[in-house]
Amino acid sequence: MDILTNFIWIPSWSQKDDCEAKIVYFRKEFVADEMDLLNTRTVRISADSRYKLYVNGNFVQEGPQKPLDRMEWFVDKADLQPFLNNGINIIAVEVLRYPECKVGKSNVNQSLLRTETPVLYVEDLMGNQEKSVSGKLGWKCCINSEIEIIGEENPAGPEPIHAEENVIATDRFAKWKMVGYDDSAWEYSSARNLFEISATIAPFHLVPRTIPQMRHENKSFTEISAIRDAGESETKYLRKAYLKMIRGEGNVRIPANTTQIVEIAAKAEECGYLLYEFARGRGASITTLCSECYAYPQPDVPSPLGGMVQTIPKKGDRTDAKNGQLLGHISYYRVAGYGTEDMAEQYEPYWFRTFRYIQLKIETADEPLDFISFSYRSTGYPLKIGTNVRVSDSTYSAIWDISVRTLARCMHETYMDCPFYEQLQYAMDSRIEMLYTYAISADDRLARQTMEAFRRSQRPDGMINANAPALNSGVIPGFSIYYILMIHDHMMYFGDRDLIRKHLPVIDGILGFFDKHLLSTGVVGKIGGPLLLHTYWSFLDWADGWSTGAPKCSMQGTGALTLESLLYLYGLQKAAELADYIELPCIAKEYRKRAESMKTAIQQTCFGVYRLKDGRQQKLLQDGPGMEEYSVHCQAFAVLTGMVTPKEGKEMLQCTVGNKDFAQPSVAFMFYLFRAMEICDIYDETDKLWDLWRYMLDKKMTTCVENNTDERSDCHAWSSLICYELPTLILGVSPCAPGYKKVRINPHLGKLKSVNGNVITPMGNISVSWFCDSNGKYKIQYSLPDGMECLNDVSQILVP
């Protein structure tokens, strides 16, 4: 039996190598004839941890898809044929290996799982042994020791991406992806046998990717935003020279022993692979700082753990290059100097960067540097927008544009909280981002991967991880309920019963966890606390005044939080509907019974009477049982869970929303407030809430802010609320039966004079147009796809 496999690695790999992030190059020469150029040439390829595949210097694809756990590993197929030449060809692979072991915080990428066995897997499916590029037939390989993978230089916190680089380049790897490169000093790879490789990535555990390859699009920067530390005439000259360079109209020659600082802008916030091209300039140093915006740094403050920590900078006009500074992540590159105008020295960092602005600090040594080109290859999930809505208020259209862009920037091989800081897939964030995706594209491929990642993250106590896939365990109890809502949302849009059956055991475990933590009063007890001070983090929202992400009462009395009881109640209600849909009436009945008990317990222990400044008294839900602390959040979920009637909910919301006496929701929680206002028939009052987004436009943002309290990141897709509201509420198209078999058309025009558009659904396109005729009366025109029923008689809808 041949126990050698197509899993290969470099023989000289040491134990020290296995505790650092490393990049390893692989290349193989092979011959293709005219017949090969006419036929598909498919290989299967994977790696631990990441690969980039090239043929004759041309980028083909990257992968594998991020693993969801350590039980399976994804494998890709790639067609080499479009890149082949008649004669000698080179297939080349860059593998980024993150260590399985952890040394402090200096070598980890928190969302990228790996095994104990570094490998590259290549299997040629052509079948011709003489021309095969399969791994076990021999490749040349070499560690690129010139590249050091470093963290994000955050002394006060985690470095969850760990993909910055410090490069001291030489000509050793110049043109290594091309035919003619001398690899005689490289090692021959060794093929792993079946007993050497991890069971996770054994051939029988390789599974095809479940999402499409990421998109790649070559783009140019658009303007020079600033030249630093130069006189007036030099600034004018350099601005013109660098502008020509980024437009592809000329080079910039930087004299020897010179320092230049240039700040370059993209049209909008981007995720992309930076590409530099140089000629000459041996020993020049390029320091690259990627930033989302211009900001105003604040003084460091004492840390509770000792020492000083950086504070989040203040932000205003994001384009204020005159008064603001660029702050962000830094990488370093020292130029080798072998490049010419005809054959430039090229550098492309391995991981994509997130940026709107780039600061380049260029310090030449003893010879001048010719900066030939600086551009990027935009990347992300291939999101195709099928929904478009046109309204009479131009600010809605502008908010739509920045929101769609934000969602796109937060979609890669997973949903991401923010692509700049963390690149982690959290349950609360992802739930509404998935809904936004359904509403504008009817694409559930990434959503299915997301739900599966959380399903596999379940712990023995029933909780799922707050983010998944994840290298480390961490629980935010309420986030497990958002996972249940994900499954319910998918039911309404796609109606996949098999998916629900697969996830229901995990849902039951989550609900069981909450049930085990009920107090004698029947409400959920203290199940979490502040981050790092409790086993679980009871995060609810980044509301102003909630420094730990939860009300102050979480550290008072019993520590129980009403909102966690409400989330449990909401989860029971939605789980009952899921059980109904897959015809499990006994389970549905059990969930509803527990839900009614929870409603009774909340009713008896969590309501208080708040005295308003005008002397009136208002019945409100407290943030904690018996605690005189109140928020909009609890009033909104009282409506969503049916704790109060729509009339009562209207009074509660109108009392608290916008009232500074009560904790107000950040943009992260605004989706749930909008749903409550919809139920209470005060949706028209949401217009003033859009002022948060109008503020973003006023501050010249091109994406939506992470939160409106500290504004840490300028790009976080839980803020892409209008992607849901515009088609679903304002245009009025929403599913009201599983699988979108039935639709409700119920517009909320508010102050708008007209709205029309097309909404893509899994069943097909729905077109709707509302307009005011010459007599001042509203009219409707609409069309539905075959097989879809409109639940309400739209001709009877009265639009104010």
Set out the residue ranges of the language-model regions:
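Alpha-helical support elements that line or immediately flank enzyme active sites
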Residues: 273-292, 358-363, 427-457, 487-494, ...
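Active-site acid/base region of carbohydrate-active enzymes
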Residues: 132-141, 357, 365-402, 408, ...
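Extracellular/oxidizing-compartment recognition motifs
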Residues: 1-417, 429, 445-446, 450, ...
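Alpha-helical repeat scaffolds
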Residues: 648-657, 686-689
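Heptad-repeat amphipathic alpha-helical coiled-coil interaction surface used
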Residues: 484, 491, 569, 573-576, ...
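Solvent-exposed loop and edge beta-strand segments that line ligand/cofactor-binding
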Residues: 263-266, 348-349, 414-427, 468-480, ...
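Non-catalytic C-terminal accessory modules of carbohydrate-active enzymes
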Residues: 151-175, 593, 600, 687-800
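Catalytic-core region of carbohydrate-active enzymes that cleave or remodel glycosidic bonds
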Residues: 668-699
